[in-house]
Protein backbone atom coordinates (compact mmCIF):
# COMPACT_ATOMS: atom_id res chain seq x y z
CA UNK A 1 0.00 0.00 0.00
CA UNK A 2 1.44 3.40 -0.96
CA UNK A 3 2.35 5.93 1.70
CA UNK A 4 0.70 8.72 -0.29
CA UNK A 5 -1.61 9.41 -3.22
CA UNK A 6 -1.08 12.04 -5.89
CA UNK A 7 -4.50 13.06 -7.16
CA UNK A 8 -4.49 15.00 -10.41
CA UNK A 9 -7.47 17.03 -11.58
CA UNK A 10 -6.27 17.14 -15.16
CA UNK A 11 -6.59 20.12 -17.48
CA UNK A 12 -5.32 21.06 -20.93
CA UNK A 13 -2.44 23.29 -19.89
CA UNK A 14 -2.06 22.40 -16.24
CA UNK A 15 -3.34 19.98 -13.64
CA UNK A 16 -4.20 20.54 -10.00
CA UNK A 17 -2.11 18.18 -7.90
CA UNK A 18 -3.07 17.18 -4.38
CA UNK A 19 -0.75 14.86 -2.49
CA UNK A 20 -2.22 13.23 0.61
CA UNK A 21 -0.82 10.67 3.02
CA UNK A 22 -2.69 7.62 4.28
CA UNK A 23 -3.45 9.62 7.43
CA UNK A 24 -5.07 12.41 5.40
CA UNK A 25 -2.23 14.92 5.76
CA UNK A 26 -2.02 17.17 2.70
CA UNK A 27 1.61 17.40 1.59
CA UNK A 28 0.97 19.48 -1.52
CA UNK A 29 -1.95 21.22 -3.18
CA UNK A 30 -0.78 23.20 -6.19
CA UNK A 31 -0.92 23.47 -9.97
CA UNK A 32 1.54 21.54 -12.13
CA UNK A 33 2.05 22.23 -15.83
CA UNK A 34 1.06 19.53 -18.30
CA UNK A 35 4.67 19.11 -19.44
CA UNK A 36 6.99 16.13 -19.07
CA UNK A 37 9.56 17.97 -16.97
CA UNK A 38 7.03 19.40 -14.55
CA UNK A 39 5.24 16.07 -14.12
CA UNK A 40 8.57 14.25 -13.69
CA UNK A 41 9.58 16.76 -11.02
CA UNK A 42 6.33 16.22 -9.12
CA UNK A 43 6.61 12.44 -9.32
CA UNK A 44 10.28 12.62 -8.29
CA UNK A 45 9.28 14.34 -5.04
CA UNK A 46 6.89 11.50 -4.12
CA UNK A 47 8.30 8.40 -5.86
CA UNK A 48 6.39 5.86 -3.77
CA UNK A 49 2.97 7.47 -4.22
CA UNK A 50 0.02 6.12 -6.18
CA UNK A 51 -0.94 8.50 -9.01
CA UNK A 52 -4.67 8.89 -9.70
CA UNK A 53 -6.13 10.96 -12.55
CA UNK A 54 -9.73 11.90 -13.28
CA UNK A 55 -9.35 11.63 -17.07
CA UNK A 56 -7.30 8.84 -18.59
CA UNK A 57 -7.38 9.81 -22.25
CA UNK A 58 -6.25 12.89 -24.13
CA UNK A 59 -5.26 15.44 -21.47
CA UNK A 60 -4.65 12.82 -18.76
CA UNK A 61 -2.57 10.49 -20.93
CA UNK A 62 0.75 12.31 -20.45
CA UNK A 63 0.46 12.25 -16.66
CA UNK A 64 -0.29 8.52 -16.68
CA UNK A 65 2.56 7.82 -19.11
CA UNK A 66 5.10 9.82 -17.07
CA UNK A 67 4.01 8.16 -13.82
CA UNK A 68 4.37 4.70 -15.35
CA UNK A 69 7.73 5.66 -16.90
CA UNK A 70 8.88 6.57 -13.38
CA UNK A 71 7.85 3.10 -12.19
CA UNK A 72 4.91 4.40 -10.19
CA UNK A 73 1.50 2.79 -9.81
CA UNK A 74 -1.14 4.78 -11.65
CA UNK A 75 -4.93 4.60 -11.76
CA UNK A 76 -7.96 6.28 -13.27
CA UNK A 77 -10.93 7.40 -11.18
CA UNK A 78 -14.07 7.13 -13.36
CA UNK A 79 -16.50 10.03 -13.48
CA UNK A 80 -19.24 8.42 -11.40
CA UNK A 81 -16.76 7.53 -8.66
CA UNK A 82 -15.31 11.06 -8.71
CA UNK A 83 -18.82 12.52 -8.47
CA UNK A 84 -19.62 10.24 -5.53
CA UNK A 85 -16.39 11.18 -3.76
CA UNK A 86 -17.09 14.90 -4.26
CA UNK A 87 -20.41 14.49 -2.45
CA UNK A 88 -18.49 13.47 0.69
CA UNK A 89 -17.28 17.04 1.17
CA UNK A 90 -19.35 20.05 2.20
CA UNK A 91 -19.61 23.10 -0.01
CA UNK A 92 -19.45 23.38 -3.77
CA UNK A 93 -18.58 20.02 -5.26
CA UNK A 94 -17.52 20.51 -8.86
CA UNK A 95 -16.65 17.54 -11.02
CA UNK A 96 -15.69 17.70 -14.68
Model-predicted regions and their roles:
Residues 1-96:
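Phosphate- and other anionic-substrate recognition elements at nucleic-acid/protein interfaces
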Amino acid sequence: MPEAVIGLDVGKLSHWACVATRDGEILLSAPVANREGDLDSLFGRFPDALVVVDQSRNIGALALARARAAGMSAAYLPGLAAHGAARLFAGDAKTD
